[in-house]
Amino acid sequence: MRIELIDLEYGVDPDHSILRIEHLVIEPGQPTALVGPNGSGKTTLLRLLHGLIRPRSGRILGLDSARTAMVFQQSRLLRMSCRHQLMLAGWLAGQPVGQLGAAADLWLKRVGLHEAAGQRATTLSGGQQQRLAIAQALLRQPELLLLDEPTASLDAQQTPLMETLFQGCQSKPHANGEPPSLVFTSHDQHQVKRLARREIRLEQGQIVSDQLL
């Protein structure tokens, strides 16, 4: 999914913009890291790309929220079993009903939660909830994957496993022949180097650098 932002501004206060972007293009197959200090606008940009909030002015071209998935810093899970949580995600993404159970089981195994399939999602530990949220996003096979500090709650053993899944989704083109677009935030510069081909730095709601890695 190719997305273009033009003359975009976002902010609740009409006299102050939290985010201001003159022009930005997100290309498919080019994993992009958003870096910068807390409060620089990284999460706001992800939320705009997901269609959760609307800009005060400007345009976002090419965005289709139905083909987008996001992993938040704080997992948003329902009071149902882990397996049903993933089956619901697949159903909402329009996947065949007869394949929902198998897909859920596959992704639970991939994120190491197969033994917790029947456990209520909201009773999992913070790291387990984050892994379930990652499985939920990847199961949807999105054309745009947005990750907000996706491994912040994970330990040193689980982080590389999740990074491998992120890299794996990049190698699988969609029906249109394009690989998924990946945009993520991270304060871990080593993770940025492992996952990203492009780094965008934000400060005080504006892009101050944009470079290929």
Regions found by a protein language model. Give the residues of each.
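Helix-to-loop junction immediately C-terminal to a conserved catalytic motif
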Residues: H50
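Q-loop/switch helix immediately C-terminal to the Walker
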Residues: M80-L92
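Conserved ABC ATPase "signature" region
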Residues: G98-A116
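Conserved ABC ATPase signature
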Residues: R120-L124, Q128
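Hydrophobic anchor residue at the start of the ABC signature
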Residues: I134
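Catalytic Walker B motif of ABC-type/P-loop ATPase nucleotide-binding domains
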Residues: L145-D148
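H-loop/switch region of ABC-family ATPase nucleotide-binding domains
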Residues: S186-H187
